[in-house]
């Protein structure tokens, strides 16, 4: 069983052309040593907790007497087993002759050919330099390549896959990956070199999981064993020592990290939302928490910085509110109330003051930050919870939504009566995540994935309905056949034979979305 819980595109121009292999020097060794100590302390805390639970269950530490307990062997029984397998005479065996047994294979060692250093072996036909060049070429990331990140869990093993997407070749493949300690919930790409104060550009990803820590990985390093940084390091160990009281604090989260958002104006700032109901602002130059906020009364599920004002943040929560806060001010944030848990929030990047809200009951709200007494419009977008909502950064009024009803829908929100352009089952199972690319040249490309564990990239410009709705923005020549790219031979995680059939809405049959 394999599922993908989150996907994210990396803008072109940030990835290294030739990613480096993981190298352990003295500095890295010392850093790993410190991280390992934290992991060891976590393991000790787990062991101590298990022993305490066992003692409580048994009553004052006494052993249980049910039939499941093991029976100790007597010394006579142990001796009998040694005799059966001749283990008592194991050290007394005579050495075998050189011409008999395993040693015989080395008896003709004098006849083996030996080549001096630098001398060519006639049986090795591949030039080492040629082999190195071939391997280097295979790892090369071209300027025309796009990187796509996918958080995958398969058979209780979680990792982040770094895909290379070649739009012109219609090719998608895994370039490298790295393991995670637990189930991933969200990904956020970072353009800041973590741990430095020189504001240098970087290529990193922050990962939120069921653990309270946030791991940050360098995407330009292959076969990395440990993350480049851990925000809130040691929080798990503290929580395990004080399980009964997960007290909220100003330094780290005490529960799962559900949402992350990087500030594209102040590049060293990252904000996180957690099941502990708090938001935390992190300084990536020091990897420390700058400030903690308690705007919500339930789990914080989604976040989005306002691109036109670096200090303004939009957040959504299971307390059925979306809130707008200026993090520089102490005053209470503005709030918009909805009828169900908030699953997604996103600013409309092409409108000055508007934003979207996606909820657990399938409704999408479009709001104006200047008037939160009512929404501009709202629509019943899906039959199930809206698990993902992506606003196209390059094409105005182009929005994608996905749901556990297994459908991805594309919307034209150019006026007060939004229209559904396409409704498509991409055969990814229950849709958990979708995201438009951030590059202008591939503006119509949408990645989606879900409960089947299959990652698909859909060139929506090849759909007739999309071309008609956004004809002024479709500049490239497109084929009549729709293009949906996926990783070949990837096993599906579940049977989709009972999926409903959905048809595109094309030509003159654009249908108005159901308005509430």
Curated annotation (Swiss-Prot):
<feature type="region of interest" description="Disordered">
    <location>
        <begin position="482"/>
        <end position="516"/>
    </location>
</feature>
<dbReference type="Pfam" id="PF00400">
    <property type="entry name" value="WD40"/>
</dbReference>
<keyword id="KW-0963">Cytoplasm</keyword>
<keyword id="KW-0539">Nucleus</keyword>
<feature type="compositionally biased region" description="Polar residues">
    <location>
        <begin position="47"/>
        <end position="62"/>
    </location>
</feature>
<keyword id="KW-0853">WD repeat</keyword>
<feature type="repeat" description="WD 6">
    <location>
        <begin position="426"/>
        <end position="468"/>
    </location>
</feature>
<keyword id="KW-0597">Phosphoprotein</keyword>
<dbReference type="GO" id="GO:0005634">
    <property type="term" value="C:nucleus"/>
</dbReference>
<dbReference type="InterPro" id="IPR001680">
    <property type="entry name" value="WD40_rpt"/>
</dbReference>
<dbReference type="GO" id="GO:0006364">
    <property type="term" value="P:rRNA processing"/>
</dbReference>
<feature type="modified residue" description="Phosphoserine">
    <location>
        <position position="497"/>
    </location>
</feature>
<dbReference type="GO" id="GO:0005829">
    <property type="term" value="C:cytosol"/>
</dbReference>
<dbReference type="GO" id="GO:0005730">
    <property type="term" value="C:nucleolus"/>
</dbReference>
<feature type="repeat" description="WD 2">
    <location>
        <begin position="252"/>
        <end position="292"/>
    </location>
</feature>
<dbReference type="InterPro" id="IPR015943">
    <property type="entry name" value="WD40/YVTN_repeat-like_dom_sf"/>
</dbReference>
<protein>
    <recommendedName>
        <fullName>Uncharacterized WD repeat-containing protein C17D11.16</fullName>
    </recommendedName>
</protein>
<dbReference type="InterPro" id="IPR044285">
    <property type="entry name" value="PWP1"/>
</dbReference>
<feature type="compositionally biased region" description="Basic and acidic residues">
    <location>
        <begin position="482"/>
        <end position="493"/>
    </location>
</feature>
<feature type="repeat" description="WD 5">
    <location>
        <begin position="381"/>
        <end position="421"/>
    </location>
</feature>
<keyword id="KW-0677">Repeat</keyword>
<feature type="compositionally biased region" description="Acidic residues">
    <location>
        <begin position="495"/>
        <end position="516"/>
    </location>
</feature>
<feature type="repeat" description="WD 4">
    <location>
        <begin position="337"/>
        <end position="377"/>
    </location>
</feature>
<feature type="modified residue" description="Phosphoserine">
    <location>
        <position position="21"/>
    </location>
</feature>
<feature type="repeat" description="WD 1">
    <location>
        <begin position="182"/>
        <end position="227"/>
    </location>
</feature>
<dbReference type="InterPro" id="IPR036322">
    <property type="entry name" value="WD40_repeat_dom_sf"/>
</dbReference>
<feature type="region of interest" description="Disordered">
    <location>
        <begin position="46"/>
        <end position="74"/>
    </location>
</feature>
<feature type="modified residue" description="Phosphoserine">
    <location>
        <position position="496"/>
    </location>
</feature>
<dbReference type="InterPro" id="IPR019775">
    <property type="entry name" value="WD40_repeat_CS"/>
</dbReference>
<dbReference type="InterPro" id="IPR020472">
    <property type="entry name" value="G-protein_beta_WD-40_rep"/>
</dbReference>
<feature type="repeat" description="WD 3">
    <location>
        <begin position="295"/>
        <end position="335"/>
    </location>
</feature>
